[in-house]
Curated annotation (Swiss-Prot):
Chief location category: cytoplasm
Subcellular location: Cytoplasm
Enzyme class (EC, first level): transferase
UniProt protein name: S-adenosylmethionine:tRNA ribosyltransferase-isomerase
Source organism of the structure: Clostridium botulinum (strain Loch Maree / Type A3)
Residue intervals passing through the bilayer: none
Gene expressing this chain: queA
Keyword S-adenosyl-L-methionine: yes
Amino acid sequence: MKVKDFDFYLPEELIAQHPMEKRDEARLLVLDKETGEIEHKIFKDILDYLTPNDCLVLNNTRVLPARLIGAKEETGGKMEFLLLKRKEKDVWETLVKPGKRAQIGARFIFGNGELKAEVIGMGEEGSRIVKFYYEGIFEEILDQLGQMPLPPYIKEKLDDKEMYQTVYSKEEGSAAAPTAGLHFTEELLKKIKEKGVKLAFLTLHVGLGTFRPVKVEDIQEHVMHSEYYKMDKETAEIINDTKEKGGRVIAVGTTSCRTLETIGDIEGKVREQSGWTDIFIYPGYKYKVVDALITNFHLPQSTLLMLVSALAGRDNIMNAYNVAVEKEYRFFSFGDAMFIK
């Protein structure tokens, strides 16, 4: 299959620039993956589509305020750092701009000097390996000095950092939010549990590779970035129990979906596990664990659009996307949601 098979026209004004004030009042396009039938709802109506046998699988990762603005120690020249991946305790793979000022041995200062950094190596694709120096707790310093690493298509500044976190976020380590989860409120989750639906949590730390364009013409040649995941015993038991009782495993977001499909065996069973995944799901892939998916609307020609096409069929998805554009749904990270059932 070719990348151009996943293209669609998206007017720029449909790219949501800020989150909804009330998370669960975003719009919801419901797509039947077998028939292609479409319904238009509000996100909190998701409750009507869930049954007591179902299990929602949510990614509890938390976004690090991983964008740091600092200065070169010698010259005072302004620098921008974006933390990509923790290599060891105080060593990170980092994108540094401008790169020419970030040679090995270069030192940088942030805030009033409470955080310092040195480039100690070169990483993949122009990234740098950076060691940080500080007193106290790194996460607390980052919380004070760092900004949210919003996707490149969001041009407006975020007033409240928590609006780019899910209400159940817990495990710090992501460079981007698992955005399907942004639509849930504490109250909606409570109602879902009261209905008898099981909630199961796993972790996948979202890397910036999630925004990386597919640069090859033939999608099978694309290589995904690897991302760290973990699933505990309790979550594995809930999912396996759901399968045994004939319930649906509903992934909240493509990150939960990719983690489940990484861990699942050919019988659709999962187990406690952690590791790195570079799974790339595109049409032709047979889902082992995931029965349904709650997700946002994705970029044209993106790997995530290919993932949803593998679940619902390319024609059904491309038709639904064209309808969403026509009906002026909001797209991407802060946009509306889709439930593929």
